[in-house]
Regions:
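N-terminal edge beta-strand
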Residues: 28-61
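Bacterial N-terminal signal peptides
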Residues: 10-20
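Short, Lys/Arg- and Gly-enriched loop/turn segments at beta-strand edges
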Residues: 69-77
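Asparagine-centered strand-capping/turn motif at beta-strand->loop junctions
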Residues: 63-67
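Bacterial N-terminal signal peptides that target proteins for export
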Residues: 1-9
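Short aromatic-acidic-glycine turn motif
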Residues: 79-89
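Sec-dependent signal peptide cleavage junction
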Residues: 20-29
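Extracellular/periplasmic metallocenter environments
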Residues: 26, 95-144
Length: 144
């Protein structure tokens, strides 16, 4: 009789232990990841629009070239060395930081930012028709 009571009590204690464990695990759900895309248009006449963009880590910035000429994007002071996802029209340069390939008219480039900070960039239009007319415009991306 004592043995049955001991087995019964052990079963109840183990059942309560597992129930407590499952209710604790249910309360620790993973935080929902929200995908954020921000678009910057590039124009040799108007520069980058918006000129300053603010967002948070995990944001994918998409640049759209609305210039007639191909453009390149280069980061100045703080370089982007780590990105989430698969960057489009970006490659890792000699210094280990991302820089863009030439983006044709109507083309896009995108980069997902994982690090916080202020990222100053310049985009250069390579004048195909008028080589002496090469232009530069600046923009800022704040990841907070």
């Amino acid at each position: 009789m004592k043995k049955k009571a001991y087995v019964g009590l052990t079963t109840i204690i183990m059942g309560l232990y597992f129930l407590a464990g499952f209710s604790f695990a249910a309360g620790n759900e993973a935080e929902e990841l929200k995908i954020i895309n921000k678009i910057i248009t590039l124009s040799t006449n108007q520069g980058a629009q918006p000129t300053t963009l603010e967002s948070r880590p995990g944001t994918t910035v998409i640049w759209v070239n609305q210039s007639r000429d191909p453009v390149e994007i280069l980061f100045l002071d703080k370089k982007v060395t780590l990105a989430c996802g698969s960057p489009v029209n970006f490659f890792i340069g000699k210094d280990g930081a991302y820089e863009s390939a030439k983006i044709p008219f109507g083309g896009t480039a995108s980069l997902c930012f994982t690090e916080t900070g202020k990222f100053d960039y310049v985009f250069k239009a390579s004048a195909t028709y008028y080589p002496l007319r090469e232009q530069e415009h600046r923009g800022i991306i704040w990841i907070k």
